[in-house]
């Protein structure tokens, strides 16, 4: 499964936002 850089960045941003929400 090959994702381009923009897709990876979008996924990372989404995951970190969810993680921040879960930790706060």
Swiss-Prot record:
Could you tell me the keywords of this UniProt record?
Ribonucleoprotein, Ribosomal protein, RNA-binding, rRNA-binding
Q: Name one GO molecular function term.
A: rRNA binding
List the GO terms this entry assigns under cellular component, sorted alphabetically. Answer: ribonucleoprotein complex; ribosome
Role according to the record: Forms part of the ribosomal stalk, playing a central role in the interaction of the ribosome with GTP-bound translation factors.
Q: What is the similarity comment for this entry?
A: Belongs to the universal ribosomal protein uL10 family.
Q: How does it assemble?
A: Part of the ribosomal stalk of the 50S ribosomal subunit. The N-terminus interacts with L11 and the large rRNA to form the base of the stalk. The C-terminus forms an elongated spine to which L12 dimers bind in a sequential fashion forming a multimeric L10(L12)X complex.
Designated name of the protein: Large ribosomal subunit protein uL10
Organism, as annotated: Enterobacter cloacae
Q: What is the lineage of its organism?
A: Bacteria, Pseudomonadati, Pseudomonadota, Gammaproteobacteria, Enterobacterales
Q: Which gene holds the coding sequence for this protein?
A: rplJ
